[in-house]
Amino acid sequence: MPRTDNDSWTITESVGATALGVAAARAAETESENPLIEDPFARVFVDAAGDGMWSMFANPALLAGAPEIESQVGARVRQMIDFMATRTAFFDEFFLGAADTGVRQVVILASGLDSRAWRLPWPDGTVVYELDQPRVLEFKSATLRQHGARPTAQLVNIPIDLRQDWPAALLDSGFDASKPTAWSAEGLVRYLPARAQDLLFERIDTLSPAGSWLATNVPQEGFSDPDLVRRQHEEMQRMRAAAGRLVEIQMPAVEDLWYAEERTPVADWLGEHGWRASATTSAELLTRYGRPVPDDAEGPVPPTLFVSAHRPAA
């Protein structure tokens, strides 16, 4: 379903369902022979949600039991799992690196089913603020409580749509804008219109004193090319058709949730505003972690840049 200005969702709908897809990929990676990451809660979320498009990623036996379907989408599923594994490792290492510099205030924007507040070894005194849609945070908190999980940092949930005045909600919840902060915007930007992307980073910039850190993944140049968009839509439609034969549930058109618009280059913008930023392509990240690089651009993972930035003292 195409996006609207004030749309909202539960964990199994719209953008919320993509969080389950990410969790399913993390579960599959965690349970693989040589995992890049360890996320013990990913499987918990997937099992709590029941069957859906995410089942294709979380349950390899589904594909193994249907070889004619596996031949169509098996490689694409593996590509998605590899991408999510390397993405997760990138952000895990970012947060632990920021903590090593003494940062004790963390903000995870559009946290979805991110479980870093429960699974990373945060230093004593760390406060983690998580922002997302109310029903998404409710599902995550309730599911983890039912399994006896306890945060490894002081956790503050802020149920809010990021199209609203989230900086005010963050400040009202105890966030200290005078302290260095580690920010993440993981898997978020492509779901925002271009102007909303600009506003997001303007707000982060305003709330970030010297010593702050930022990590995000953003659409790579060419993301909005009409021919590439068309080919990606066709490929995703084939994947949905195959998935629909594995689980008896309608597959949402995830690509319709993206905004294929020309955007401000984030790393350049940050550099112009006092940050030291670097960008890594998804292909470079896959290579760094020893995962194969897809030989085409129209698969389930659009061209992506991973940006990390630090604001030094003036």
UniProtKB/Swiss-Prot annotation:
One of its GO terms (biological process) is methylation. Belongs to the UPF0677 family. Pfam families: LCM. S-adenosyl-L-methionine binds at residues 132, 161-162. NCBIfam families: mthyl_TIGR00027. Keywords: Methyltransferase, S-adenosyl-L-methionine, Transferase. One of its GO terms (molecular function) is methyltransferase activity. It is an enzyme of class 2 (transferase). Signal peptide: none annotated. Exhibits S-adenosyl-L-methionine-dependent methyltransferase activity. Its EC number is 2.1.1.-. This is Putative S-adenosyl-L-methionine-dependent methyltransferase MMAR_5323. InterPro entries: Ppm1/Ppm2/Tcmp, SAM-dependent_MTases_sf, SAM_mthyl_Trfase_ML2640-like.
